Amino acid sequence: MKLIAELCQNHNGDINTLKDMVVKSAESGADIVKIQSIKANSLTKREEYESFRKYSDEYERLSSLELSMDDELEFIHTAKANNVTPMTTIFSPNHYDYYNSLGYDYLKLSGYSMRAFDYGLKLDKFNFKHLVFSTSSLHLHDIKKCIDNLQGVDFTILHCVCLYPTPFEKLNLASIEHLKTLHDKIGFSDHSDNLLSSKQAIFQGIDMLERHFTILDEEETRDGKVSVTPKELQELKTFSNYTKEGQYLTLNGFDEQQRFNHEYYQGRFKW
């Protein structure tokens, strides 16, 4: 299983913080490190969402997080120097010349970006080896349509819920089992605020796990609440390396109260 450290916006636009994140995630067991290639000038203004998130405020925020081409090249170099695969999420699918010039082997499209197929997205214009797309905001018929559009492409589907953090009752990890019937490479982009859901998905046999990653305090970044620390990322990597039986025993281990109850009920009646 490949473990993605999603660095997202947790670098706060600082290249040195970003490079430190790459090193720390590599040391913690990440196979892939991912950023988000956000360009503020591609942001659209929609009046119906101004009360939810004002355009001017969002533009200013994204501008402060934007990475230059030189920053992205340095990110790629740092990743490769630390033996992890660099990856990015693209938000402007028509800017293929930009991404091709950077040389990413792994690209990601979010669920809502996959609808770009309806507007003429041509993946054959991109130079990449593997594509990842998440199911956030996609209905089942949309997912099937994406699979049809990706014939001949090496890709992984990530089960994903577009809630930050995702409450337990909304995780719907059973979806992973159904996605396995549609495609052979299935993963999970986990936006929960714990490790249990990730471990459960690993036990279910996913091929790829994505977790937001931070080296800063939770309150210092926008995605802090759904981000794992280096220690937590290492815990997930260690769990993924267990045998299936080892994973089962870890997930189903008895705590002190369970052991007490077991011993109590075991001797409760005479045989």
Predicted regions and their residues:
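Catalytic cores and adjacent flexible loops of soluble metabolic enzymes
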Residues: 1-271
